[in-house]
Amino acid sequence: MENFFNQFFESIGEDKNREGLKETPKRVQELWKFLYKGYKEDPRVALKSAYFQGVCDEMIVAQNIEFYSTCEHHLLPFLGNISVGYIPKEKIVGISAIAKLIEIYSRRLQIQERLTIQIAETFDEIIEPRGVIVVCEAKHLCMSMQGVQKQNAIIKTSVLRGLFKKDSKTRAEFMQLLKS
């Protein structure tokens, strides 16, 4: 890692021995371990260990779960909120497990579209609800800092499975809950 940063500093015309940069390779290495720890965790385990047989058969919504991730195209952050709604069949999941699922997938090099799909597919596979919906809203620093340089653009993605995909009233109920 140190050689990588020494070459990087040299390529941009920076002095690798400058006081403020001497410890940067070590600091960044520790930061990257934290930012990308999602590769060392199994998102399925996070859900499998946190569900129980439920008595609820109505919609459950976890709204505005904050996340940050790193765009795999430019290695710049994107951050925002994810909301997950589901209609249980037999299993109900602890709300913190939904946040953990989001954290595991977002702590990887990502694109927003895949992040949204992975959350929905894993939830659907492990919890087996009658329906699941995932809505992700994010600001991409790669869009703000370079290229088109649009500071206030918000990108929204969604994935629908089961009743949310088949029934427009169910979708509308979820969207109304997000607004209230």
UniProtKB/Swiss-Prot annotation:
The keyword Hydrolase applies. Zn(2+) binds at residues 71, 74, 142. It catalyses: GTP + H2O = 7,8-dihydroneopterin 3'-triphosphate + formate + H(+). Coiled coil: none annotated. One of its GO terms (biological process) is one-carbon metabolic process. GO terms for cellular component: cytoplasm. Its EC number is 3.5.4.16. Keywords: GTP-binding, Hydrolase, Metal-binding, Nucleotide-binding, One-carbon metabolism, Zinc. Pfam families: GTP_cyclohydroI. The keyword Hydrolase applies. Signal peptide: none annotated. InterPro entries: GTP-CH-I_C/QueF, GTP-CH-I_N, GTP_CycHdrlase_I, GTP_CycHdrlase_I_CS, GTP_CycHdrlase_I_dom. This is GTP cyclohydrolase 1. It comes from Helicobacter pylori (strain ATCC 700392 / 26695) (Campylobacter pylori). The lineage of its organism: Bacteria, Pseudomonadati, Campylobacterota, Epsilonproteobacteria, Campylobacterales.
